[in-house]
Amino acid sequence: VLLSIEDIYNQHPEFEKAKIIERLVEPDRIFTFRVTWVDDKGEVQTNLGYRVQFNNAIGPYKGGIRFHASVNLSILKFLGFEQTFKNALTTLPMGGGKGGSDFSPRGKSDAEIMRFCQAFMLELWRHLGPDMDVPAGDIGVGGREVGYMFGMYKKLTREFTGTFTGKGLEFGGSLIRPEATGFGGLYFVNQMLQTKGIDIKGKTVAISGFGNVAWGAATKATELGAKVVTISGPDGYIYDPNGISGEKIDYMLELRASGNDIVAPYADEFPGSTFVAGKRPWEVKADIALPC
C-alpha cells in the first residue's frame, strides 16, 4: 500500500514534515473487550472483541465487523489501514476502521448467534454513531448478524440512525447490498481489461469462496460473457469446465441458505464438475483470478 503512494508522497516535502506516513500507519484508537454470552446449553462462553478506529481524516470511521476464529488485533489493524485507503478512493467522506471477534458462527444456532451479537454490541455501542463510526458486515457477518447488532444498538441508544450498513431491507438496507461488492469487482476488472483493449467475453474466471462477494462476482462475470470455472469453500474447491452460471449459482445459494457452506455437494449435483478436497482453486488455469 505504501509503495503505491511513494511517488506522490516524495513530491510533497510538507507531507514528510507533518509525519503523514507515521500518522497513517498507526490507528487513532483501539478498543479491546471481553464478550461474555450464554450458549444453548446454558454454559457461559467468552470471546475477545475488537474495534480499530484507524483514521477519520476525511470522515467517520467505516469498515466491517468480522466474526472468525482467526481474528486477532494484528489482522484487524492491517485491514483497518487498508480500509482507510479503499474508502478514500471512493471520493466519499469516509474514514477507515475494522472490527470483529474470534467468535465463529459456524455450527452455532440462530439463538446463539443472536445472543453473541447482542453481547458484542453491549460493549461496543457507545463508540459507534453515524458521525463517529459506521460498521458493516464482513466474513461471518451478514444481514442477519448486522440486524441483531443494529437491533441492540437501537435499544441501547433509543435512536434509529444510519449507524450500520449491510442491514436487511426491513431495517432500511440497500436493495442490492449482497451483490454490490462482487458486481463492483467485476466492473473494475472489465474496465481494466478495456484499457488494455481486451474483451472480457469468453475469458475464464477462477473464483475462490462462495459468500456474497463471490456470488455477486460469479453472477456479473456470467452476465458480461465470461465463464466462471471455480468456486471454493472450507472443504475444497469445485472445478466446472462447463461454467458455473444460472441454475448452478442458484443451487449454491440454496445450499448456503440451508446453513451448509461446503461445496462438495455441487459435484454430485452437476456431472462433469470435479471436487478437489482441501485445496484452493489457484492451480486451475484461468484468464482471471478473483480471490473473494
Give the positions of each predicted feature:
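Short, Gly/Pro- and small/polar-rich lid/capping loops
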Residues: 1-32
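Structural signal for hydrophobic packing residues in well-ordered secondary-structure cores
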Residues: 5-13, 80-88, 117-132, 150-161, ...
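Glycine-rich, N-terminal phosphate-binding loop and its surrounding beta-alpha-beta segment
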Residues: 31-105
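Structural motif
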Residues: 50, 93, 100, 131-133, ...
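Glycine/serine-rich phosphate-binding loop and adjoining beta1-alpha1 elements at the start
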Residues: 68, 87-201
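Glycine-rich phosphate/diphosphate-binding loop of Rossmann-like nucleotide-binding domains
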Residues: 165-168, 173-282
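Ligand/cofactor pocket segment of small-molecule handling proteins
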Residues: 282-292
